[in-house]
Amino acid sequence: MATAYHNLSDYDFNSVPNAENMRFGIVVSEWNNNITGPLLEGAISTLKKHGAKDKNILVQTVPGSFELTFGSAQMIKSGKVDAVIAIGCVVRGDTPHFDYVCAGTTQGIAQLNAEGDIPVIYGLITTNTMQQAEDRAGGRLGNKGDECAITAIKMLDFKEKLQKTQIF
């Protein structure tokens, strides 16, 4: 989706379907909340801009990014959502912890997508510096939360269109 120095909030508003009848779950990491907070705000704002109702947006927090997979799985099992947006931020440090958390979270979310009927949108920012994270959480490169919300809407629209398609 995003490329180097691409503004994550730039998109054609009219290309995004109406989300009025869609239900969204957002699982957000408490760790690095100075980043995940603005990402969450961006996602919610964008969902609402495209017709999502407050009552159809369920937000739950988890302690860290590694827990996003479990939180997303539980949200899916609840039956209360049509799509899940997983939001987190991991900034590289001096130990291999960054690599383990990023790989585990990425693999977990990929597995949920491969095995399930509910799209789980990957909103994990993985950066080398806090400045890079800030740039992607409402800074000079836009807000990845916007991008995640749009992706969730488009994936639900994709799923709905596919279910209605008849091939003979």
From Swiss-Prot:
Q: Which GO terms describe its molecular function?
A: 6,7-dimethyl-8-ribityllumazine synthase activity
> Has the keyword Transferase been applied to this entry?
yes
**Which Gene Ontology cellular-component terms appear in the entry?**
cytosol; riboflavin synthase complex
Q: Which Pfam families match?
A: DMRL_synthase (PF00885)
**UniProt pathway:** Cofactor biosynthesis; riboflavin biosynthesis; riboflavin from 2-hydroxy-3-oxobutyl phosphate and 5-amino-6-(D-ribitylamino)uracil: step 1/2
Q: Which GO terms describe its biological process?
A: riboflavin biosynthetic process
Q: Taxonomically, which superkingdom?
A: Bacteria
Q: What is its EC number?
A: 2.5.1.78
* Binding locations of (2S)-2-hydroxy-3-oxobutyl phosphate: 94-95, 136
Keywords in UniProt for this one? Riboflavin biosynthesis, Transferase
Residues engaged in binding 5-amino-6-(D-ribitylamino)uracil: 31, 65-67, 89-91, 122
Q: Reaction catalysed?
A: (2S)-2-hydroxy-3-oxobutyl phosphate + 5-amino-6-(D-ribitylamino)uracil = 6,7-dimethyl-8-(1-D-ribityl)lumazine + phosphate + 2 H2O + H(+)
Query: NAD: is it a keyword of this entry?
Result: no
Which residues are annotated as active site? Answer: 97
Q: Which PANTHER family match?
A: 6,7-DIMETHYL-8-RIBITYLLUMAZINE SYNTHASE, 6,7-DIMETHYL-8-RIBITYLLUMAZINE SYNTHASE DMRL SYNTHASE LUMAZINE SYNTHASE
Q: What does this protein do?
A: Catalyzes the formation of 6,7-dimethyl-8-ribityllumazine by condensation of 5-amino-6-(D-ribitylamino)uracil with 3,4-dihydroxy-2-butanone 4-phosphate. This is the penultimate step in the biosynthesis of riboflavin.
Family according to the record: Belongs to the DMRL synthase family.
Checking HAMAP family in the record gives:
Lumazine_synth
Q: What is this protein called?
A: 6,7-dimethyl-8-ribityllumazine synthase
* Organism (species): Phocaeicola vulgatus (strain ATCC 8482 / DSM 1447 / JCM 5826 / CCUG 4940 / NBRC 14291 / NCTC 11154) (Bacteroides vulgatus)
